[in-house]
């Protein structure tokens, strides 16, 4: 596909006009709060930033009092937020315009299905493809829900601006409404006073389902089937997209995730989807006013109508309405039953009363009876629309909404299994045994001994009790809400086969694993570069065990593997991580093929390039050919969720991109000469080995690097920011390796170095180019012909464009000694070298030369939110001197929020 991206067609003039209006409203609101004299300083800061008079700007900010800092920090934090809204509104407008006028754009579903339909196995491809965005609550979503609600109001008002210009909406009323919400934002706390709880995170993410995701997913699948039907394909129960959830089940490094939070997550999701069904059935009740005087119904619908408690005389001749009333009553009873009885299985007793549905399938069957009755009695015109979409929603969301993943660190499983084996007098020192002996013991317990190890009366440790409670809750959830409510358990830091069998032992304890099947799929997560390298041999051996073959066969021959982008990047740098992931996918796919197993990948990507982020379409289509069979899962993290799914139009577009990119990659083999590809891989091996050494020499080999990072970034302030339930580190931070990848990347974004997205790239390429004058031409050829390499370098280009070494230099001044400051000199040299080399390989004269949309976006915002960095630096200085006071420390957090908002992909 060579069609342009939809974003590239955004109306830049319209965005600029709207930003001007929003800026004036913010200016007026600020003047009202502080007066013209104080506001003049804000005007001066904007002028100095635009003119790039950095030293003068820094001096002026140093003169601000703490009280003046409050308003200035808020102003420059809110301005990029308003710019984001304008861009999102225009993207939504462009999406609707392109679709309504049947204009093609990159990733458009109709064009993609046209492409797939030409394949010999098109029916199989279209029927089986499944993309799963998994929403997570990593600590990168810095906005309060209150602020999100207010911005949604502004978003909706801005959508109406074109009507205002056309004169169909009163301009003054529109302006007054907009001013009110801007003033509300200016006077609302931007950050949270208290750290989020897991239950808060669950509730927050449900807002996206209510506002956009349920409708977006349902609409997309309905359209997908319609377009496929036009091409002659009947897809039946195809689910090209389903949703996943980590919140409530991801306890790796998060002690606040328990059996109770897992249950709450499932029940909250159940409540959300049941309420959606109730509302939709209510809509159908109002719509289906068909009278028996004018139409006929089936006996099955008549029986439903007769059981309805709607006894109004006005309904005597409206059996469809009575049938929908009966269905709605059963849904309400289901909701009440699950709320009151929690995870007890649904029971049916007296057939005369309104009883809860025992399953989503039972609910669907009732809807199908109505559809069948309409088809049989000349009512086919009433089927399309709400009824069809509701049936589709039930197929996708069931009574569970999104499948919850469980995740835990492998060391926790080992600790628990060691305790179980010791308490059952099987082996006293399991953890000390060599790998072969561990596997032998675990296999014996899994294949030969049906007993439950935890049944002994020996007192259990707190960690074992907690883990067993979670697994027992998972079993109850599956029994009550269906198998799909929890399908995977991920093992962080998978380093051996025993890591996977240890989880199997824990699952066996609660009846989720036996010799024939695993009701919860065991998913290894390979994170570091070393683990990725070792993953081939681990999986090659694991797939050959008879019990594993049975588990996989019971799972339709699929085995999922999760790939960690964040830790591999922190471990070896951007190039090393990207190449290790690429090779691992290639080789793991081949291992699966050799064993008759479909290996599917779960991509643990973050919002930033340093954590595997970047444009979703390009990321998926640049995966190794053959690595996407028909299923792919990927995490959607932090503020990326809000950016992608904050409103229904943009949500639909991003879901469409995921499905189209996956289908495109499944059927399109980008032509790369096989001999060339072998050569390309050898070149990458050489460059990556060099890049890894350069990266690790600084991060882990330079004795001053640790001190530099903690002095020249707001890492301590980020760690104390109330932006998620998870701690910033698994333990007390004494070295870089102990820091979680997310705050690591977040902090480098704040000081504008964007270190994880490019360091080690420039020198490695330069060394290769200097070896032979023809090597630059080879790299340019690779960039033009190899999608993986093109995507890799395009992401570096994007990261460099968001970095700012002038600002980074000011952060470096926060270091206390010259040796530590020298670390920045090394970073600066590498940054300049990387920029030069990337431009040379791309044959470009400037960064973002082929990304006009992002370039325009940065042009709007950079002059304004650059000011925030200088404010943040001054605030950090004052805090470290003890001059801020406890009541003003949150000012730093406000600036952190603003920078993250301006960059739009903080972690």
UniProtKB/Swiss-Prot annotation:
Xref: InterPro entries: PEP_COase, PEP_COase_bac/pln-type, PEP_COase_Lys_AS, PEPCASE_His_AS, Pyrv/PenolPyrv_kinase-like_dom
Cofactor field: Mg(2+)
Taxonomic source organism: Streptococcus mutans serotype c (strain ATCC 700610 / UA159)
Cellular component aspect of the GO annotation: cytosol
Family: Belongs to the PEPCase type 1 family.
Function: Forms oxaloacetate, a four-carbon dicarboxylic acid source for the tricarboxylic acid cycle.
Protein name as it appears in the record: Phosphoenolpyruvate carboxylase
Gene3D superfamilies: Phosphoenolpyruvate/pyruvate domain (1.20.1440.90)
Class of this enzyme: lyase
Catalysis performed (reactions): oxaloacetate + phosphate = phosphoenolpyruvate + hydrogencarbonate
Domain of life: Bacteria
EC number: 4.1.1.31
GN (gene name): ppc
Keywords from the named record: Carbon dioxide fixation, Lyase, Magnesium
A molecular function GO annotation: phosphoenolpyruvate carboxylase activity
Active site: 138, 570
GO biological process: carbon fixation; oxaloacetate metabolic process; tricarboxylic acid cycle
HAMAP family listed in its UniProt record: PEPcase_type1
